From Swiss-Prot:
It catalyses: L-glutamyl-tRNA(Gln) + L-glutamine + ATP + H2O = L-glutaminyl-tRNA(Gln) + L-glutamate + ADP + phosphate + H(+). Belongs to the GatB/GatE family. GatB subfamily. Coiled coil: none annotated. This is Glutamyl-tRNA(Gln) amidotransferase subunit B, mitochondrial. It comes from Ajellomyces capsulatus (strain H143) (Darling's disease fungus). The lineage of its organism: Eukaryota, Fungi, Dikarya, Ascomycota, Pezizomycotina. GO terms for biological process: glutaminyl-tRNAGln biosynthesis via transamidation; mitochondrial translation. SUPFAM superfamilies: GatB/YqeY motif, Glutamine synthetase/guanido kinase. It is an enzyme of class 6 (ligase).
């Protein structure tokens, strides 16, 4: 039975008394964390296919009589310091083969030792995905031989997983296909815990290096029901599940950092004909499915499904039959490729693990975790859009939620809090949330993109960003000075914002009307044709260019664009 004992990053943790457990594994190797490689074809046909993929997953007119059905299996690394079945550290960035126990490398006589703390993020994931957490679950062995699995089997939960019967709702804001309307609900068959494999690195001359630090690192596998009928919606489903897992602290990283990958099961059938002969996970009337493994980005999920959909339809139109098999897809490819024939369940030789007892989870544990579950993405989205404190657009709110494993959102909220305390006297019309959102996403985001840097909340601390925005909103500095301050802080200037402003003499000193008139008249004298076009042809859009010229010949830290334009309008349009 699990009992509460300490807190895990602020959330209660529990101790489990294990009596007995079981496991199972696969007989092929789906190499869970592959290195993507490009496989570009330069033929006109391939270029045309890639262009069609980029337009989205909607089927072309000639495919409208065909129904696509997709089920997804998502493998995610749990956010835990412990391995699943050994006392070794789960850290991945240490020296290769430095975090291993005897069981991790399957030394004879070693046995698995279940680590109860790994259950906490797993249960949080199940609750967030609306699953029924099972009071009793068991581990099984899934047998296969591959170099990165020294035991010859993987420990998983095939027969009695710890969570079942979940669901996820995808709305239009999640980026689903237009044909799915305002929203679609996807069922989740089960979530099971399983151990990761070693990390392999291929070298020339058929040489492989193996790092066993990753062996027995805890994973969860989330299996959806085959209820998705669009490649676009399938990608949106993976994206939404990743966001949910990150929001509750269940996983380490997302697809972009290699902490999550997906396999997809794809089948097609002709709508005008009788229902298909196949049934998967209780969903009947489907066509023969194929499985595409090891997809490591949202676009890979979408493009691989499109490629396999088109391949299957072409085969069936030509009078052929679809073989149940495992296929692969590589970055840049327009076609899937056969990896192997699909093995039957018997080939994995699933069997209960005799070295592990059942996992028994008490109702009090589930209730406590449910009570303390952090905000889910849809709840966060609603708050960021509807709360006057933030007032973001749906697009900006979704972007903040999805960026950098939630770290950008936390940074944004910190900056809003700080800015609000700095501005108790400002007008109610000033929206701290909107202004900070623009700076975090666009100004700071632009610097990150330009430098190809990864997100680091300490590169420009939230306090510094709030101080810059505060100075700008009070018109103590100009917009160009604010951007310069941000760039200096981003590039490593460790001085306080106030010190930089003082050292660089950036405090705004407004120009007099006489100074504005002199600058405007000089710019008009240098650009008579532009002035004539504005005056005679009412080409007011060119006024901004003249404002830029005033900034160029004047002091950019003293010129206010609005006042400069007012003077120009007065002189040109009088």
């Amino acid at each position: 039975m699990i009992r509460q004992f300490v807190s895990h990053r602020g959330i209660p943790c529990y101790r489990l008394a294990v009596r007995r457990v079981e496991l199972t594994e696969p007989f092929h190797h789906p190499s869970p964390w592959p290195l993507g490689r490009k496989n570009w074809s330069t033929s006109d046909e391939a270029k045309s296919k890639r262009a069609a993929m980029r337009k989205g997953g909607a089927p072309p007119p000639e495919h409208e009589d065909w129904e696509l059905t997709v089920g997804i299996e998502i493998h995610a690394q749990l956010d835990t310091d412990a391995k699943l079945f050994s006392s070794a550290s789960a850290a991945l960035d240490d020296v290769p083969n430095s975090n291993i126990a005897l069981f991790d490398i399957a030394l004879p006589g070693s046995q698995p030792l279940f680590q109860p703390s790994t259950l906490i993020p797993a249960i949080r994931a199940a609750i967030a995905l609306n699953c029924d957490v099972q009071r009793v679950s068991r581990f099984d062995r899934k047998h296969y031989f591959y170099q990165d699995q020294p035991a010859g089997y993987q420990i998983t939960q095939y027969y009695e997983p710890y969570a079942k019967n979940g669901s996820i709702w995808l709305g239009a804001h999640d980026g689903i296909a237009k044909e799915d309307g305002e929203g679609v609900q996807i069922g989740i068959k089960q979530i099971q815990m399983e151990q990761d494999t070693a990390k392999s690195q291929e070298l020339p001359s058929s040489t492989y290096l193996l790092d066993f630090n990753r062996v027995s690192r805890p994973l969860i596998e989330i299996i959806t029901l085959p209820q998705i009928h669009s490649a676009t919606t399938a990608a949106a489903c993976v994206r939404k599940i990743q966001a949910i897992l990150q929001s509750v602290g269940a996983v380490t990283t997302g697809m972009e950092m290699g902490g999550l990958r997906a396999d997809v099961n794809v089948s097609v059938r002709k709508r005008s004909e009788a229902a298909g002969d196949h049934q998967y996970d209780g969903v009947a009337g489907l066509g023969q499915r194929t499985e595409i493994k090891n997809l490591s980005s949202f676009k890979a999920v979408e493009y691989a499904i499109i490629a396999e959909r088109d391949r299957q339809i072409a085969v069936l139109k030509a009078g052929g039959t679809i073989q149940g098999e495992t296929r692969g897809w590589t970055l840049g490819s327009t076609e899937t490729r056969k990896l192997r024939g699909k093995e039957g369940e018997v080939d994995y030789r699933y069997m209960p693990d005799p070295d592990l007892g059942p996992v028994i989870i008490g109702d009090d544990v589930i209730s406590d975790l449910r009570r303390n579950i952090p905000g889910l993405p849809d709840e966060l989205l609603q708050m960021l859009v509807q709360d006057p404190k933030y007032g973001l657009s749906t697009v900006d709110a979704k972007t903040l939620i999805e960026l950098d494993d939630g770290q950008r959102l936390e940074y944004y909220q910190d900056a809003v809090e700080i800015l609000t305390t700095l501005q108790p006297d400002l007008s109610a019309d000033f929206s701290a949330g909107k202004v900070v959102g623009n700076w975090v996403l666009h100004e700071l985001g632009g610097l990150l993109t330009k430098s190809s840097a990864h997100w680091d909340s300490q590169r420009v601390p939230a306090q510094s960003l709030a101080e810059i925005i505060n100075l700008l909103s009070r018109k103590n500095i100009t917009s160009s000075s604010a951007k310069s301050l941000l760039a200096m802080a981003f590039d490593g200037d460790k001085r306080s914002i106030s010190q930089i402003v003082e050292d660089k003499n950036l405090l705004f000193q407004s120009l007099s009307r006489h100074e504005y008139l002199a600058l405007a008249e000089e710019v008009m004298r240098q650009n008579p044709k532009m002035v004539s076009e504005i005056r005679e042809k009412a080409q007011l859009g060119k006024m901004g260019w003249l404002v830029g010229q005033i900034k160029r010949i004047g002091d950019p830290n003293r010129v206010e664009a609005q006042k400069a334009e007012e003077i120009l309008r007065e002189l040109i349009l009088k």
